[in-house]
Amino acid sequence: CCDDSECSTSCWPCCY
């Protein structure tokens, strides 16, 4: 996962 400001919810594939 990533540690984005909006993708840091849990482990969403929006940062892949």
Swiss-Prot record:
Belongs to the conotoxin M superfamily. It comes from Conus textile (Cloth-of-gold cone). Keywords: Disulfide bond, Hydroxylation, Secreted, Toxin. This is Conotoxin tx3j. Transmembrane segments: none annotated. Its main location: secreted. The cysteine framework is III (CC-C-C-CC). The modification 4-hydroxyproline is found at P13.
